[in-house]
């Protein structure tokens, strides 16, 4: 039994959920999201709640996945998502100019990123980055791409890390 799939989603008053063929559209105060919704999972909308059901036992995993995806879409169009990254290292800097993010993270050249559609990038300080958007998947993917430029290393902890990430540190070699 999919426990996540059986949970009911509360739909806020300012949000509308519509199904058009195999696509589902969620509109809210922050914007609009559309994505493919598997036809093997059905949902019923009544009294500001959404109930999910599946056609067969083979679709258990899909049941919970589609419910979680729709819940994150609803949360995205109402509140949005924010990922915060921190740069740790001497001379590591980030500068956001419009849709471009420029990183100086120890390479001989600056690394430039173009923010995807629907994502805004801010740099409150030279060593912190804030990524905001309505799509949890797009915000998380963009944050992961930035982190992959210079992931935190375990000896000194230098690199780009998520704000709440714990970097497990290792001891260096012991001398004779």
Curated annotation (Swiss-Prot):
Q: Name one Pfam family in it.
A: Ribosomal_L6
Keywords in alphabetical order: Ribonucleoprotein, Ribosomal protein, RNA-binding, rRNA-binding
Task: Please tell me whether the keyword Ribonucleoprotein is annotated for this protein.
Answer: yes
Instruction: Tell me which InterPro entries the record gives.
Output: Ribosomal_uL6-like, Ribosomal_uL6-like_a/b-dom_sf, Ribosomal_uL6_a/b-dom, Ribosomal_uL6_bac-type, Ribosomal_uL6_CS
From the UniProt record, give one GO term of the biological process aspect.
Answer: cytoplasmic translation
GO cellular component terms, semicolon-separated: cytosolic large ribosomal subunit
| Source superkingdom | Bacteria
Output one GO MF annotation: rRNA binding
SUPFAM superfamilies reported in the protein's UniProt record: Ribosomal protein L6
- Fill in the subunit field for this protein: Part of the 50S ribosomal subunit.
User: What NCBIfam families does the record point to?
Assistant: L6_bact
**Family stated for the protein in its record:** Belongs to the universal ribosomal protein uL6 family.
Physiological role: This protein binds to the 23S rRNA, and is important in its secondary structure. It is located near the subunit interface in the base of the L7/L12 stalk, and near the tRNA binding site of the peptidyltransferase center.
Q: By what name is this protein known?
A: Large ribosomal subunit protein uL6
Organism of origin is: Lactobacillus gasseri (strain ATCC 33323 / DSM 20243 / BCRC 14619 / CIP 102991 / JCM 1131 / KCTC 3163 / NCIMB 11718 / NCTC 13722 / AM63)
What gene, per UniProt, encodes this protein?
rplF
């Amino acid at each position: 039994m999919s426990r996540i799939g059986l949970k009911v989603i509360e739909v806020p008053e300012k949000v509308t959920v519509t199904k058009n063929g195999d696509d589902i559209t969620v509109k809210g105060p922050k914007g609009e999201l559309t994505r493919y919704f598997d036809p093997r999972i059905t949902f019923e909308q009544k009294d500001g709640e959404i109930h999910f059901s599946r056609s067969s036992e083979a679709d258990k995993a899909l049941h919970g996945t589609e419910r979680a995806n729709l819940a994150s879409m609803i949360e995205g169009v109402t509140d949005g998502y924010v990922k915060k990254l921190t740069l740790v290292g001497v001379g590591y800097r980030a500068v956001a100019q419009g849709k471009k993010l420029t990183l100086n993270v120890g390479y001989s050249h600056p690394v430039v990123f173009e923010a995807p559609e629907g994502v805004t990038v801010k740099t409150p300080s030279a060593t912190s980055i804030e990524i905001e958007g309505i799509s949890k998947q797009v915000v998380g993917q963009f944050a992961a791409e930035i982190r992959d430029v210079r992931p935190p290393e375990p000896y000194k902890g230098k690199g780009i890390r998520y704000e709440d990430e714990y970097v497990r540190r290792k001891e260096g070699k012991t001398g004779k």
